C-alpha cells in the first residue's frame, strides 16, 4: 500500500465522513433505489412505489452501515421531474444521510435540486452530476440552489486517457472551455466527489482505475465510480451466462454476475477509491462485507506507513 504526498481532502456532511489517505477512512457505499425496472416501482413516470418495501431497503443499507462502519448513501434515480421529486421527498423522511439526486433528465435533476432547497433538505443531497454535457441553465439552477455536494465527472469524450481525465477537471480538456472543478466551484459546490468515469471493458476501463490514483496524487480530492457497470456491459460475460442458462445452470449464471458485479467494487476500493456507487440497493448485504473486507486489508498495510485508522472503521469493528 502507499501514502500520497499530496494532502488529501476529507469530506464530512450529512453524517458521512470519507476521503483522506488510503486506510484512514472506510469507503462510502451508495446503493441505487427506484432504478429502471426496480420491482418496488409501480409507476415510473409518476413516481408511485411500494413505500414499505422502499423503507425496508433503505433501513437494511443503514443497518449494514452500522455493522461495518462504511458510510451509506442512497442514490435516488427518477426518470421524470414528478417521479424524482416524489422519490426524494420520501427518502428525506426515512433517511437523514447523504442521498444522490440522479436522473438521465436534466429537467428532473433541476426540479430535484429546487425541491430539496424549498423543503430544507438540500444539505444532505449530492447532485449527479457536473459534467461536460451540462447545460448553462442546469448549472445556473444548481448555483441558485442550496445543494453543496456534487459528483464531478472527469470524462472527456474527445480524450478518454488518464491525461484527458485530469485535463477536463482542470481546464475543460478538448471539449469544454472551463474546467469541471472551476464549474463546480462557480455552482457553489463545497464538496466535489470526483467520478473517474469507468467505460466498458476494452474501451478504457483501466484508464479510469489509473485515474483514481492520478486524481488523488495530483489534486488530493476524493474519488470513486460506478464501476459495477463494467460487468453489465461485458459482452463475453453476457454470452457466458447465456451458455450456462442453456445448460440448465440458472443459479450459477446468476452467481457469476453477482461475483463480477460486487467484485468490481473491490477493484475501485483497491485503487484508492473513497466511495463506490455499487448499484442496486438490494445488494447492500453483498457489497458492504466485500468492501469492508477490502478496507480492512488496506488499513492494516497503511498502518505501517503511519496512517491512523478512524475508530469507526471495519478494521476496528469486525475483528
Curated annotation (Swiss-Prot):
Pathway: One-carbon metabolism; methanogenesis from CO(2); methyl-coenzyme M from 5,10-methylene-5,6,7,8-tetrahydromethanopterin: step 2/2. The gene is mtrH. The keyword Translocase applies. Coiled coil: none annotated. The keyword Lipid metabolism does not apply. The complex is composed of 8 subunits; MtrA, MtrB, MtrC, MtrD, MtrE, MtrF, MtrG and MtrH. Belongs to the MtrH family. It holds the Pfam family MtrH. This is Tetrahydromethanopterin S-methyltransferase subunit H. Part of a complex that catalyzes the formation of methyl-coenzyme M and tetrahydromethanopterin from coenzyme M and methyl-tetrahydromethanopterin. This is an energy-conserving, sodium-ion translocating step. MtrH catalyzes the transfer of the methyl group from methyl-tetrahydromethanopterin to the corrinoid prosthetic group of MtrA. It comes from Methanococcus maripaludis (strain C5 / ATCC BAA-1333).
